[in-house]
A protein has these predicted regions:
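Interfaces and regulatory segments of ATP-dependent nucleotide/adenylate/phosphodiester-chemistry enzymes
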Residues: 2-213
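Active-site beta-strand-loop-beta-strand hairpin of nuclease catalytic cores
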Residues: 242-253
């Protein structure tokens, strides 16, 4: 009884309750995952390691530039600046009443701090924002609640004026650095190929973090993937292992 009460309470917090749900434990775990909020600095680091430094992604970076007319480095720099600006804005403005335009950011604000062409900045802002007219038109044509969620997730800036933008949701804004960026790559013509390449790049990224952890640890040793068994039926081990005196952690990304 108490478990069901907790489930319904958490569901109400999320503004959604599935009456058909029978497994309250899996629903609880789902809510925890959906509520997870990564640090945006970690997202930026992850984006740089995968989308910029991993050369297997280079060919998709060219497609990204062709489709969006923006280099991925420019996109990451602009988005990070926007997040940083809004994050520090409350300390500068204070908690009292203020004009909504004080919370806004413009392409000129970004240009004053970053060495990026103003046309590129405007293109990025248009990619991640929506105007009032666009908002109304989309809601009229897409009554599905799920589609509304995805629309705001990918466009978390609201254009309150011709060149003034404010964030709709802080978490969605931070997700522009990695989660939304990945979906932008998936919209390229070679989605299936990108998904496979991204999976390998993400695996290398995760294993590099684990390897680095073990390198600086005095109690742990890292061992990577290896092949075993006779030819021609050789098999591959899991992706990695963390070895210590207490046991072994097997990693499969």
């Amino acid at each position: 009884m108490m478990n069901m009460f907790i489930h319904k309470m958490l569901a109400r917090i999320c503004d959604y309750h599935d009456e058909r749900c029978e497994n309250i434990y899996s629903e609880f775990i789902k809510i925890l995952f959906n509520s997870e909020r990564d640090k945006y600095i970690a997202k930026m680091y992850r984006a740089i390691k995968i989308f910029i430094e991993d050369h297997d992604i280079d060919k998709y970076n060219n497609l990204f530039l062709y489709k969006y007319n923006v280099d991925v480095k420019e996109y990451i720099n602009v988005v990070y600046f926007i997040i940083k600006e809004f994050t520090s804005m409350q300390d500068r403005i204070g908690s009292g009443e203020c004009n909504i335009y004080e919370w806004g950011i413009s392409s000129q604000d970004i240009l004053n701090k970053l060495n990026i062409d103003i046309d590129k900045i405007d293109s990025i802002l248009r990619m991640i924002s929506l105007s009032y007219d666009e908002w109304i038109l989309f809601l009229a044509n897409n009554p599905s609640q799920k589609e509304r969620f995805y629309f705001f997730r990918d466009k978390p800036l609201f254009a309150i004026d011709k060149n003034i933008y404010i964030p709709i949701d802080g978490r969605f804004l931070e997700e522009l650095l990695f989660d939304t960026l990945r979906r932008m790559y998936e919209k390229l013509e070679t989605k299936s190929n990108f998904s496979r390449t991204f999976g390998k790049s993400f695996e290398r990224y995760i294993l590099s973090l684990i390897n680095e952890f073990c390198f600086y640890s005095k109690q742990h040793t890292y061992m990577g993937e290896f092949e075993y068994g006779p030819e021609p039926l050789r098999k591959k081990s899991p992706d990695g292992f963390i070895i210590s005196e207490d046991g072994i952690v097997v990693i499969e990304v």
